[in-house]
C-alpha cells in the first residue's frame, strides 16, 4: 500500500533519450542531450579551437613600438577578413627525436631515470639527481664517485663573480 501512495505522488518517470550524435548511448539534458563521451569530445574540440584562435590572434598582433615614416605602408598589414582559423595537430615525424639528441651529446648513453648511471642498480624514488643530469644510487651520488662531468668550480667562480663585482676606486690625487 505504501508503494501505491508513493507512486501516485511522485513524478512520472521520463523515458531516456538517445544521444543526439547517434552513437547509441543515452544522452543527458545537462550535456545538451549528448552522452558523456560525445559531450567530452565536443568540449575538447571547443577548447582546442579557442586555443587556436587565441594563438592566431596573439601571433598577428603588430609591435606597438615600430616607427613608420608618414606615407609608408606597414609591411605586415593584414586584413582580418582574409584570415582563416587553422587547427594544427601534432603528427609523429619520421625522424626519431632520440637520434637528434644523441648527436648533440654522444658521451652519455640514454638510460632510464630509475637506475643508477654508474652501477645500473634500481634506485626508484630514492635516486639522487646530479647536476650532470644523471640519477645515481646512494654510493655513487657524490661527484668524485661517478666521475661527474659538471664543473662545480666554474659554477662557483661565476656565482662569486656575479655576487661580488669588481670595485675600482678612483685614483688618489697627490698634493
From Swiss-Prot:
Binding, Zn(2+) 3: 130, 132, 146, 148
Question: Where is Zn(2+) 1 annotated to bind?
Answer: 19, 23, 35, 38
InterPro entries, alphabetized: AN1-like_Znf, AN1_A20_ZnFinger, Znf_A20, Znf_AN1
SMART domains registered for this protein in UniProt: ZnF_A20, ZnF_AN1
Q: Which GO terms describe its molecular function?
A: DNA binding; zinc ion binding
A20-type zinc-finger residues: 13-47
Q: Name one GO cellular component term.
A: plasmodesma
Cited function = May be involved in environmental stress response.
Q: By what name is this protein known?
A: Zinc finger A20 and AN1 domain-containing stress-associated protein 7
Native source species: Arabidopsis thaliana (Mouse-ear cress)
Amino acid at each position: 500500500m505504501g508503494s501505491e501512495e508513493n507512486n501516485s505522488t511522485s513524478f512520472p518517470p521520463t523515458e531516456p533519450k538517445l544521444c543526439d550524435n547517434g552513437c547509441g548511448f543515452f544522452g543527458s539534458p545537462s550535456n545538451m542531450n549528448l552522452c558523456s563521451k560525445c559531450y567530452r569530445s565536443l568540449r575538447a574540440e571547443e577548447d582546442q579551437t579557442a586555443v587556436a584562435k587565441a594563438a592566431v590572434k596573439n601571433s598577428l598582433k603588430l609591435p606597438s613600438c615600430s616607427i613608420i615614416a608618414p606615407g609608408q605602408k606597414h609591411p605586415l598589414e593584414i586584413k582580418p577578413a582574409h584570415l582563416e582559423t587553422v587547427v594544427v595537430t601534432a603528427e609523429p615525424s619520421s625522424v626519431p627525436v632520440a637520434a637528434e639528441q644523441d648527436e648533440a651529446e654522444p658521451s652519455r648513453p640514454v638510460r632510464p631515470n630509475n637506475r643508477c648511471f654508474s652501477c645500473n642498480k634500481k634506485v626508484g624514488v630514492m635516486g639522487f639527481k646530479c647536476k650532470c643530469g644523471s640519477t645515481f644510487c646512494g654510493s655513487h651520488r657524490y661527484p668524485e664517485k661517478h666521475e661527474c662531468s659538471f664543473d662545480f668550480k666554474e659554477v662557483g667562480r661565476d656565482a662569486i663573480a656575479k655576487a661580488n663585482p669588481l670595485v675600482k676606486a678612483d685614483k688618489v690625487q697627490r698634493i
